[in-house]
């Protein structure tokens, strides 16, 4: 909520959105438009954490620029789904970027000889965006196969991009993680009672079948 002019509280100086969200959900464009319109009326800038903006664009069937147009500044990640080894991009007006570069220098965030990183980033932008739909399809395939395992509940309302969230009402999480490690698969334990799996360019449909077989075995034995 945007604060009013009550003298007891500071004014709202920035609205931050994330699309796609780390929960796996994609914000609809109608919501983005509403927030941006309200922010402009109140003269409050909007920053978009677009670490997964290209995944959101694929999910919505639109260009990433359309999503970015409903924010004053955007950050997007070159690793994650795009596959670069490191790096993010900050996007905004010329004046904004000038101030950001100054701030980066003040904070000691500059990097020397970073051209090789830029080369990987260019490759990610030019070659990797068009294949993100494959990751989304693999996530849905993974979700479908996981549902065939007794005791698994897929969070279907959060299956918008390349993330699969699920709950498992059997087996001991720590034992399952250890058993999979012995089978050559590393997996994070659940946060609370919720597991998260993410598909990417390094995970093939064959890899998913292998994982499902070994995960099923681990669940039954633990």
Where are these regions (language model features)?
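Conserved PLP-enzyme active-site core in the AAT-like
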Residues: 1-170, 174-183, 187-194, 198-203, ...
């Amino acid at each position: 909520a945007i604060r009013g002019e009550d003298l007891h509280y500071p004014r709202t100086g920035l609205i931050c959105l994330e699309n796609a969200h780390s929960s796996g959900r994609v914000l609809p464009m109608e919501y983005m438009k509403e927030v941006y319109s309200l922010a402009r009326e109140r003269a409050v800038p909007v920053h978009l954490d677009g670490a997964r903006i290209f995944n959101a664009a694929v999910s919505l069937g639109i260009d990433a620029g359309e999503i970015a147009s409903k924010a004053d500044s955007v950050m997007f990640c070159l690793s994650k789904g795009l596959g670069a080894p490191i790096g993010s991009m900050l996007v905004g007006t010329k004046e904004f970027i000038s101030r950001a570069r100054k701030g980066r220098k003040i904070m000691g965030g500059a990097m020397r000889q970073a051209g090789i990183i830029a080369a990987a980033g260019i490759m990610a932008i030019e070659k990797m965006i068009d294949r993100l739909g494959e990751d989304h399809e693999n996530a849905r395939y993974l979700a479908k196969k996981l549902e065939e395992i007794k005791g698994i509940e897929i969070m279907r309302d959060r299956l918008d991009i390349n993330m699969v969230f699920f709950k498992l009402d059997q087996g001991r999480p720590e034992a399952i993680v250890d058993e999979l490690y012995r089978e050559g698969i590393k997996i994070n334990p659940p946060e609370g009672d919720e597991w998260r799996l993410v598909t990417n360019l390094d995970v093939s449909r064959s890899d998913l079948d292998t994982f499902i077989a070994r995960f099923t075995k681990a669940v039954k034995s633990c």
